[in-house]
A protein has these predicted regions:
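A short, structure-level motif marking secondary-structure boundaries and short turns
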Residues: 14, 61-63, 97-99, 119, ...
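Glycine-centered loop/turn motif at secondary-structure junctions
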Residues: 36, 85, 120-121, 142, ...
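N-terminal helical cap/lid subdomain that shapes the substrate entry/recognition surface
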Residues: 3-108
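Asp-based, Mg2+/Mn2+-dependent phosphohydrolase catalytic module
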Residues: 1-9, 115, 129-237
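Generic recognition of short, well-ordered alpha-helical interface segments
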Residues: 71-76, 112, 162, 226
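Residue-level signal for well-ordered alpha-helical scaffold segments within enzymatic catalytic domains
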Residues: 26, 30, 75, 79, ...
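Substrate-recognition element of Asp-dependent hydrolases with the DxDx(T/V) motif
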Residues: 91-140, 148-151
Length: 237
């Protein structure tokens, strides 16, 4: 493998750094138990994330005006509860449930892997999450980024090329010496289109319970790993 010259590493956050599936499933179970509701927590969790992805893509394609991740999550949450005929939850409690996405737990390798990489490279979050969410998530998990960048800075969502190009420009780096790390092929394909290097991280249940991404030929990515801790080893070769 050709040695990669990298100075800046950008990380997707939801699913890549944080295990959204396990965290939201637990929050959904707690919510259901608290209000004595009866529904399939796995299906609800998967549909919440799928609904976000659908609205996010509409924003990125110009079919919807810009909405923050918090706003999209709330819109989808209300739709899911309406479909279940659940309409007696107070606004305050709905907001708290929606903020489950602020309380995600990181993958076991995330903190140690990021800490090691930070010793050698500039590391930055580059996420579809709004900035307030990213700050809370990082603070709650004691993750110390060099930079936190949100797609809300650019008024769109990944994989819009202007997100990646804008992020590189803000950190005064260049695309050829920047790497995007993500557990979604579409995210990395967007980074490739912007001229960046890429690293695919396998994460279970990222596209729903037991569902694998149709990621195609992984050889188009510069690195393919099972954990963050592998990235440093590859880059040092």
């Amino acid at each position: 493998m050709k040695k990669l010259k990298i100075n800046t590493i950008f990380f997707d956050v939801f699913g890549t750094v944080f295990d959204w599936h396990k965290s939201i499933r637990q929050e959904t179970t707690n919510f259901s138990s608290k209000y004595k509701l009866s529904f399939d927590e796995f299906v609800f969790t998967d549909n919440w994330r799928a609904g976000f992805r659908l609205l996010q893509s509409k924003v990125a394609n110009g079919q919807r005006d810009y909405l923050s991740m918090d706003e999209i999550h709330m819109e989808v949450l209300n739709q899911l509860l309406d479909e279940l005929n659940i309409n007696d939850i107070s606004k305050e409690n709905l907001v708290n449930f929606n903020e489950s996405w602020h309380r995600l737990k990181p993958w076991d390798d995330s903190i140690s892997g990021l800490s090691d990489l930070k010793n050698h490279y500039i590391i930055s979050a580059l996420s579809n999450g709004n900035l307030s969410m990213l700050v809370k998530l990082s603070k709650n998990s004691n993750i110390h980024w060099d930079s936190i960048l949100s797609t809300e800075f650019f008024g769109t969502y990944k994989p819009d090329p202007k997100v990646y190009l804008g992020a590189v420009k803000l950190l005064e780096s260049n695309a050829e010496e920047s790497m995007m790390v993500a557990s979604h092929a579409y995210d990395l394909d967007g980074a490739i289109n912007a001229g960046m290097k890429t690293c695919y991280v396998h994460r279970p249940n990222e596209f729903g319970t037991g569902i694998s991404e149709n990621y195609g030929d992984l050889s188009r990515f510069d690195l393919v790993v099972e954990s963050f801790e592998e990235i440093s080893g590859y880059l040092k070769k």
